[in-house]
Amino acid sequence: MLDQDLDDIHPLFQGAPQTTEFKKLRKRIVRYTREAVEQYGMVERREDGSLPKWLVCLSGGKDSYTLLAVLYELKWRGLLPVDLLACNLDQGQPGFPATVLPEFLEKMQVPHRIEYQDTYSIVMDKVPQGRTYCALCSRLRRGNLYRIAREEGCSAVVLGHHRDDILETFFMNLFHGGRLATMPPKLVNEEGDLFVFRPLAHVAEADCEKFARAMNYPIIPCDLCGSQDGLQRQQVKQILDTWESNSPGRRQVMFRALMNARPSHLLDPKLFDFTGLALKNIDNSTETEEIPELR
């Protein structure tokens, strides 16, 4: 089904490049996304036959555009039985082009909701000078997205984090948090009433960037994050870039390791019962000729 002509698809793909290179890129992204959706059980099968509804978060960055496009292609081809609602949270950052996303979504015939919440002022007021904005900004954004999802009757909030985000988070937790953890592809929020999905979990950042650029999507940079130097994530990204440059394919090897954990070969007694290890009850005795007792 993925070999259909590009013109016979959702408007998000209309005008896509007809090059062999782009077609291979598109098919790879679609394949990896479908793989993650199926592997992590993201689609609910409801007894009443109704379709689950997903809130697809759209920031205006390359990753969220790629996410929206690939989910709509899967749905268009009958491979994703869900209803999709795109959502942009305008957080009141100075210079944010408020009309870009609504106009784009209208043109692409995508159902959407645009929400304005001035979290920018809260972040600037609460975060001390010299500290990073990302943690508080993300927490405020996530809270608003959960609220919107509930108001719209959605069962899941869908985010555009990709393979490289997941790797970077793993190493940030390793280097700065002293734990082995990262962004999971699927989780339930603390309240227990919403799923959080990351369908691009297997997709490389470079592929998202190539795709969004080739499609000429109107990219909106995050000037708030980009205005800060020395961010931990940026430092980790530079380390991973160096490793990848020295050993091409290193990122994918490390990512596969996250899918191949061996608790018995780590050191966390909460994950593996080391105290319960026991030797097999093997009888090592052998029959020997009885030696007469000396008198």
UniProtKB/Swiss-Prot annotation:
- Name of the protein: tRNA-cytidine(32) 2-sulfurtransferase
GN (gene name): ttcA
Q: Which domain of life is it from?
A: Bacteria
Q: Which cofactor does it need?
A: Mg(2+); [4Fe-4S] cluster
Matching entries from InterPro entries are given as: Rossmann-like_a/b/a_fold, TilS/TtcA_N, tRNA_Cyd_32_2_STrfase, tRNA_thiolation_TtcA_Ctu1
- Which Gene Ontology molecular function entries are recorded, alphabetically? 4 iron, 4 sulfur cluster binding; ATP binding; magnesium ion binding; sulfurtransferase activity; tRNA binding
**Can you supply one Gene Ontology CC term for this chain's record?**
cytoplasm
Return the broad EC class. Answer: transferase
